[in-house]
Amino acid sequence: TDTRHRVTNWTLEKNKATDRPSNTIQLPDWNYNGVSQVTGTSNTFVGTSFVELLRQNGYHTIHCGKAHFGSIDTPGENPTHWGFEVNIAGHAAGGLATYLSEQNYGHTRDGKPYSLMAIPGLEDYWGTGIFATEALTREAIKALDKAKKYNQPFYLYMAHYAIHVPVDKDMRFFPKYIKKGLSDKEAAYASLIEGMDKSLGDLMNWLEKNDEADNTAVSYT
């Protein structure tokens, strides 16, 4: 629980708590650097990831999407430090600058992030018109295709940045909800939800097509 590991709020920058100032309560010195598998960083909960245990027992381990395990420049920020052999677009941030490839998911034209929330690792999709949710899904399927060749069990942790602000419009689905009479904001929110639904369906279809559906446990939380 949060009270055991003392990561009681969202994390981002190293050694910086994200609490709002309060004149009425004394804020605790919580673990605002997040979690890690190694010692040496203050205000960090140290523990062993179950993903590391899976890796040690022969699983090929894949992370795709939001990580948000540890603050920037701490060991915990990188999913590969948690037993993941493959990391797709995971870093310290728990949010995102934008879902839009037209804005390079938070990067300038010369490739520099203009926000700490810029999504890394999706350069191949910049400027393509592909929404971040779809880009992550495609990359996850590519990783599964590779995993299929390794002749070992696999673990995919699919952690979409959706649903999270900014509530960008996924134009694959947005017009449908406008036609249903929803406001722009409501329709945009609904489009984020349907994008996640499609992603789950695509992954389930991969399991079916590759004869893995009856041999795979799927947990949706």
Feature map (PLM): residue ranges:
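The substrate-binding groove and active-site-proximal loops of carbohydrate-active enzymes
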Residues: G34-S42, L122-E134, S183-G195
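Catalytic-adjacent loop/helix segments of enzymes that bind and process anionic phosphate/sulfate esters
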Residues: A93, A97, G121-M158
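Conserved small/polar residues in nucleotide/adenosyl-binding loops
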Residues: Y220-T221
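Active-site neighborhood of glycoside hydrolase catalytic domains
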Residues: G195-W206
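Aromatic- and acidic-residue-enriched segments that line the glycan-binding/catalytic groove
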Residues: D73-A89, P166-K180
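Active-site segment of extracytoplasmic enzymes that catalyze sulfate/phosphate-ester chemistry
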Residues: T1-S49, L53, Y59, D73, ...
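Catalytic metal-binding/acid-base residues of hydrolase active sites
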Residues: R4, A67-H68, A93, Y161
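Active-site His/acidic residue clusters
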Residues: A140-A188
